[in-house]
């Protein structure tokens, strides 16, 4: 398997390079197996079983989470009697999305309406590959490492909270996670100290009225028209209401609608409408008031229409805030394993990830892994044709093994 790394041409292959030469294609096959058999948040039974079995075959003990899906696995150095204290955790998320896989490939999803369009299959293959490497190279392991295979990242407020409540961070001194980044070419590692993602909330808006004939909308509540008004006016109103709170960001909030449904017939005004929205902000100060602002502005739009509004607002995940020292360690590891030119500073994104709950408990680094084929199209996350350059799997394993080695080597020089 050919990896895109600056270090691949060194005269003396490293142990991880030799291991990937032997096992890299197996990791790609594993990823394709996961890709073809995706499971939704909380339903990752087969995925959990597969990871558990692979760990067992390597002589490792894993513990399933109390929620039924997901697991953790500790590896400690040979001869260590200290137990798991001061360890490094590496996290992968297991779940897929409720959307169709539109690719024409052999490993296309075999589950209708479910696909790995966010790269969690890649994350799982990388973290599992790193665990399998250290299972056979314990003599190279400088300290205890916990491998976290987390369920339900896509379900607000996220399965990371289940890991935390299940003691998944006990004894952990720092945590590192990576995520596929289709805007970066394969072989590129994106890093950022401080906030690297945004807070992400969700809302379901219900609108109801008496219904009636479209010939006489003045005698009832025009729910379709009202829903359209909510969709067109609410984003601007919310943005204006929070504009004074934080002056450190060019934009403070995005309200984007993913679903709108009201009625089925052209000549019938419906009695019910439903709107689903995501609400995102890069600012913690804005996030603290966002639910109240959203509700107030929604009711302001609906007021006087005669409709009844029902709001189910879910406070989701905060921004992921990367620890400067841990991020520096990952950067040094990436430069050593892949070459300094492979490391790139990235901007804070509007995406959200429940990895944020981990970084509220222990110092951590959330890393963006380039997966774009330089000669192919850019395929965005959560899109039906999303796919990755599979050379990124070996690169991810190289990065994480180097991060483990660098983490236990001592304090980073900032």
Model-derived features: where do they sit?
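General structural feature for long, well-ordered alpha-helical segments within catalytic domains
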Residues: 12, 23-26, 30, 43-54, ...
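Active-site beta-loop-alpha junctions enriched in small/polar residues
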Residues: 39, 93-95, 152-154, 181, ...
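Non-cysteine beta-strand/loop elements that form the S-adenosyl-L-methionine
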Residues: 89-91, 100, 203-205, 366-372
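Divalent metal-coordination and catalytic microenvironments
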Residues: 34, 90, 120, 147, ...
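Histidine/acidic-residue-rich, glycine-tolerant segments that coordinate divalent metal ions
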Residues: 72, 97-99, 103-115, 121-122, ...
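Metal-dependent amide/peptide-bond hydrolase catalytic core
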Residues: 1-7, 228-414
């Amino acid at each position: 398997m050919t990896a895109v790394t600056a270090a691949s041409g060194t005269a003396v292959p490293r142990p991880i390079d030799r291991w990937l030469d032997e096992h890299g294609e197996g990791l790609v096959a594993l990823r394709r197996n996961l890709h073809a058999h995706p499971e939704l948040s909380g339903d990752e039974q087969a995925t959990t079983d597969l990871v558990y079995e692979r760990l067992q075959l390597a002589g490792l003990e894993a513990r399933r989470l109390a929620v039924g899906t997901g697991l953790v696995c500790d590896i400690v150095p040979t001869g260590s009697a200290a137990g798991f204290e001061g360890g490094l955790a590496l996290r992968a998320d297991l779940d897929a999305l409720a959307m169709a896989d539109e690719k024409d490939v052999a490993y296309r999803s075999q589950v209708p309406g479910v696909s790995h369009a966010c790269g969690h299959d890649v994350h799982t293959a990388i973290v599992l590959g790193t665990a399998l490497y250290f299972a056979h190279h314990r003599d190279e392991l400088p300290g205890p490492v916990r491998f976290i295979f987390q369920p339900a990242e896509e379900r607000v407020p996220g399965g990371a909270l289940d890991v935390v409540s299940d003691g998944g961070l006990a004894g952990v001194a720092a945590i590192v996670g990576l995520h596929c980044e289709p805007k970066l070419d394969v072989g590129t590692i994106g890093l950022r100290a401080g906030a690297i993602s945004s807070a992400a909330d969700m809302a379901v808006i219900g609108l109801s009225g008496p219904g009636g004939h479209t010939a006489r909308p003045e005698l009832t509540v025009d729910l379709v028209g009202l829903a359209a008004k909510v969709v067109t006016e609410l984003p601007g109103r919310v943005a204006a209401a929070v504009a004074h709170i934080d002056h450190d960001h060019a934009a403070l909030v995005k309200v984007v609608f993913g679903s709108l449904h009201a009625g089925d017939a052209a000549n019938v005004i419906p009695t019910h409408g439903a709107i689903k929205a995501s609400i995102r902000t890069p600012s913690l100060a804005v996030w603290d008031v966002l639910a109240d602002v959203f509700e107030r502005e929604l009711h302001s739009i609906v007021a006087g229409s005669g409709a009844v509004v029902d709001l189910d607002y879910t406070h989701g995940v905060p921004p992921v805030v990367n620890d400067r020292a841990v991020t520096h360690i990952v950067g040094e590891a990436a430069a050593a394993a892949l070459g300094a030119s492979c490391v790139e500073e990235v901007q804070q994104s509007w995406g959200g990830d429940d990895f944020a709950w981990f970084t509220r408990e222990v110092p951590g680094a959330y890393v963006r892994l380039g997966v774009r084929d330089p000669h192919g199209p850019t395929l965005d996350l959560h899109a039906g044709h999303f796919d990755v350059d599979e050379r990124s799997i070996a690169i991810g394993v190289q990065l994480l093994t180097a991060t483990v080695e660098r983490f236990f080597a001592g304090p980073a020089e900032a």
